[in-house]
Design a protein with these regions (language model features):
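Selective recognition of hydrophobic, aromatic-rich stretches within alpha-helical transmembrane segments
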Residues: 44-72, 129-169, 207-246
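Interfacial aromatic "cap" segments that immediately flank transmembrane helices
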Residues: 2-31, 82-106, 151-203, 250-251
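A cross-kingdom feature marking solvent-exposed beta-strand/loop segments within repeated
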Residues: 72-81, 177
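Membrane-helix interfacial "entry" motifs
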Residues: 5, 9, 42, 46, ...
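Short alpha-helical linear motifs
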Residues: 107-113, 196-200, 213-216
Length: 251
């Protein structure tokens, strides 16, 4: 698997579709309305921004799922915006996230309720450093559980895009099989490469934000959409390597 090729093609991807790129930029304008309203101290603009934010949530996750799908096919085309399909896909992504977060949320409440109810006794019966260490372990356990399921969710979303099937994306054992077929070392290399790329883009973003008056808008409406397009397309390209081990896709 050529990780450098995946990253290189992903970086080029938004700029091969300059005619359609404004579609994403316009969508991201929706989330800029609330801070603009706050800056103007205008409650009407803030209200419009709240409505626009919900529209954003209904459309954008589904649209980026479509970009992942394009990446799995290794196509260079930016998908056209179909409102109905984007809303349907956004709902599927939301359901997927809710299901995959059941375990982390359950662990969070179980551990906090258990430790919380005993915290007073622990505070009196344990040395202070022991009390802090216990709470630290609880927080660490919650964090690890969350990161594991967030990682699984990442590839479940790619599976959803690839197979266009929510039930398939909810099959955790199939998602784990996909991860194994892609290869944990390949995924690790991809994550490191993407982190480096995102850090570079974030540095550029910080310079853009410093531009008076328009920097904030340029960042939200141009830099962030490009960053999201690169990340989602790259995930799709990474997942496309599952073809070589397609037995994990059996329904």
């Amino acid at each position: 698997m050529n990780i450098s090729k995946i990253i290189f093609n992903s970086v080029k991807y938004p700029f091969k579709n300059l005619a359609k790129l404004p579609i994403i930029c316009i969508l991201f304008i929706l989330i800029a309305i609330i801070p603009i309203g706050k800056l103007l101290d205008n409650n009407y603009v803030v209200l419009i921004g709240v409505i626009a934010f919900f529209i954003f949530i209904l459309i954008v996750p589904g649209y980026f799922l479509n970009i992942i799908k394009v990446g799995t096919r290794e196509s260079a085309m930016l998908p056209s915006l179909n409102l109905v399909n984007s809303i349907q896909d956004s709902i599927r992504v939301l359901i997927l996230r809710m299901v995959y977060m059941i375990v982390p949320v359950a662990v969070f409440f179980i551990l906090l309720s258990t430790v919380g109810s005993e915290s007073i006794k622990m505070l009196y019966n344990f040395p202070f450093h022991g009390f802090i260490a216990t709470f630290g372990l609880v927080i660490l356990a919650i964090l690890i559980t969350y990161l594991i399921f967030e990682f699984l969710l990442f590839f479940a979303k790619a599976r959803l895009a690839y197979l266009n099937s929510l039930p398939e994306a909810l099959k955790v054992h199939r998602v784990i099989a996909d991860i194994n077929n892609i290869g944990l070392f390949n995924i690790f290399k991809w994550i490191v490469a993407m982190l480096v790329l995102m850090v570079v883009i974030s540095i550029v973003s910080s310079w853009v934000i410093a531009i008076p008056y328009v920097g904030f808008l340029i960042d939200i409406c141009v830099i962030i959409p490009i960053m999201e397009s690169i990340a989602n397309y790259s995930l799709g390209m990474l997942y496309s390597n599952i073809d070589g081990n397609s037995h994990s896709l059996v329904r």
